[in-house]
Amino acid sequence: MDKPSFVIQSKEAESAAKQLGVSVIQLLPSLVKPAQSYARTPISKFNVAVVGLGSSGRIFLGVNVEFPNLPLHHSIHAEQFLVTNLTLNGERHLNFFAVSAAPCGHCRQFLQEIRDAPEIKILITDPNNSADSDSAADSDGFLRLGSFLPHRFGPDDLLGKDHPLLLESHDNHLKISDLDSICNGNTDSSADLKQTALAAANRSYAPYSLCPSGVSLVDCDGKVYRGWYMESAAYNPSMGPVQAALVDYVANGGGGGYERIVGAVLVEKEDAVVRQEHTARLLLETISPKCEFKVFHCYEA
């Protein structure tokens, strides 16, 4: 537990909590400070970490990630990282999280895409952050997320009550025809990346634009990473598919630099009104100039 991974299994979490004589919920704040060292903040030098407890009993980490020489909106916020980590690992709900600094409005909004978001419990470990005096903390010091965004705008305003939300199962029923490729050649490696990106696109959460997309990355050791587009009802806090795949890379790539990423595939609809190709290309060309980037167009079967 001295060097926490980005996912801590439930039995390991229970064991660590027992050793410290605390509950698993009380364990969360103690993991925040060591997790801050995992942040990648070459611009702000302000490391943020968030540690969340899912309904499965597993603990998940999130950190902020910044990209020099790019507009700031390409950045990954710690709470976005956490939610992406949850989706990549099939976690169905976030129950509690402890965070090193109060979530910005961007992240408070993004978290609304989780079902029953106002009931998620949050603890801010920074002693300089004082809670709203009208908000009542529980016995462990956690507050309802609803107290941080009391008059929320979210999926309830735009979607039916039974529509699957961000952490819930999705299948967008997308397929690819080889004729839709806009690249030349097709090695076994690129075929695998294409299938991984297609699978990611099928898990994409895009209920507002109906423009799902997915990305796969491969590093110089042949290890593959993936991520998918996740929308916010407020649009701007949405998580891009490349950023989501980079969460997988940061969490599972052994701490290497982005120059180790040598290949990338994006799958999206050709007629999408929200397209990822141009911004994805800019991001990848900036962080890994030698990365070979390919785009495949999909259609709904």
Swiss-Prot record:
Q: Which GO terms describe its biological process?
A: cytidine catabolic process; cytidine deamination
Listed GO CC annotations: cytosol; mitochondrion
Cofactor(s) needed, names only, are:
Zn(2+)
Binding-site positions, substrate: N64, V65, E66
Q: How is its activity regulated?
A: Inhibited by uridine, CMP and dCMP.
* pH and activity: Optimum pH is 7.5-8.0.
Catalytic activity reads:
cytidine + H2O + H(+) = uridine + NH4(+); 2'-deoxycytidine + H2O + H(+) = 2'-deoxyuridine + NH4(+)
In what tissue types does this protein appear?
Answer: Expressed in roots, rosette leaves, stems and flowers.
EC assignment? 3.5.4.5
Q: Which domain of life is it from?
A: Eukaryota
GO molecular function of the protein, one example?
zinc ion binding
Positions bound to Zn(2+) = H77, C104, C107
Q: Which SUPFAM superfamilies match?
A: Cytidine deaminase-like (SSF53927)
Per the UniProt record, one Pfam family is dCMP_cyt_deam_2
Per the entry, the cofactor note is: Binds 1 zinc ion per subunit.
Domain CMP/dCMP-type deaminase as annotated: residue spans: 23-156, 188-301
Listed under subunit, the entry gives: Homodimer.
Under the heading PANTHER family, the entry gives: CYTIDINE DEAMINASE
This chain belongs to which protein, by name?
Cytidine deaminase 1
Where does this protein come from, organism-wise? Answer: Arabidopsis thaliana (Mouse-ear cress)
